[in-house]
């Protein structure tokens, strides 16, 4: 191509008064990125607000600690029912209960580790409950069996194991449901709420099953 032709062809450029496609595209990208950054900042702020780590005196920490201890006694009683019960239905419910509640203990203890809190706290048990429920003089939470009752269950045999287990576990589960309800009144932390709801539902179901077995076993 001759130099004359090259000189005759207008140089390709973008008129500042009429932005070309490349300028418009860059502008749109800039606006989109700005919007995304603002959206991300708002989402992060909201997340930090709702996902704040529970502290030492929080209801979530109190629930995790107290329900772990409450569940631990239920697991002990359930394993005795599984090992020594006479009715196959009692042994089965004991087995299922021990697995479920031991798994929930694992979840709650993991939360405490993630929140950098100790398994036990300095506050009295149940102080986090909104209705002011307190432990009894022996330090037992609602529904928990006394040491003497646990000893009786250890020493019982056959049908007596079934009867003792049913009576003690119904009371124990009623206390556990009450604790779960207390947490649900004051917490909106998703994982804690989910576990409390699942625990409440499972215990209510087992209370109904135990009451049917109580009638069947006299």
Located regions from the model:
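All-alpha RGS (Regulator of G-protein Signaling) helical domain and cognate RGS-like helical scaffolds
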Residues: 2, 18-218
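N-terminal intrinsically disordered, acidic low-complexity segments at the extreme N-terminus
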Residues: 1-12
């Amino acid at each position: 191509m001759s130099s004359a032709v090259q000189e005759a062809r207008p140089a390709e450029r973008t008129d500042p008064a009429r932005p070309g496609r490349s300028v418009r595209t860059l502008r749109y990208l800039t606006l989109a990125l700005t919007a995304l950054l603002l959206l991300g900042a708002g989402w992060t702020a909201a997340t930090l607000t709702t996902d704040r780590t529970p502290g030492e005196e929080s209801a979530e920490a109190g629930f995790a600690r107290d329900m772990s201890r409450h569940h631990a006694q239920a697991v002990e009683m359930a394993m005795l029912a599984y090992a020594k019960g006479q009715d196959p239905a009692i042994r089965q419910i004991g087995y299922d209960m021990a697995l479920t509640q031991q798994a929930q203990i694992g979840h709650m203890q993991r939360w405490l580790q993630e929140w950098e809190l100790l398994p036990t706290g300095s506050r009295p048990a149940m102080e986090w409950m909104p209705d002011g429920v307190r432990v009894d003089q022996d330090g037992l939470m609602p529904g928990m069996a006394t040491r003497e009752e646990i000893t009786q269950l250890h020493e019982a045999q056959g049908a007596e194991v079934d009867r003792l287990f049913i009576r003690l576990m119904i009371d124990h589960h009623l206390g556990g449901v009450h604790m779960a309800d207390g947490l649900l009144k004051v917490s909106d932390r998703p994982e804690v709420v989910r576990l409390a709801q699942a625990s409440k539902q499972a215990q209510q179901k087992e209370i109904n099953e135990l009451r049917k077995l109580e009638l069947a076993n006299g």
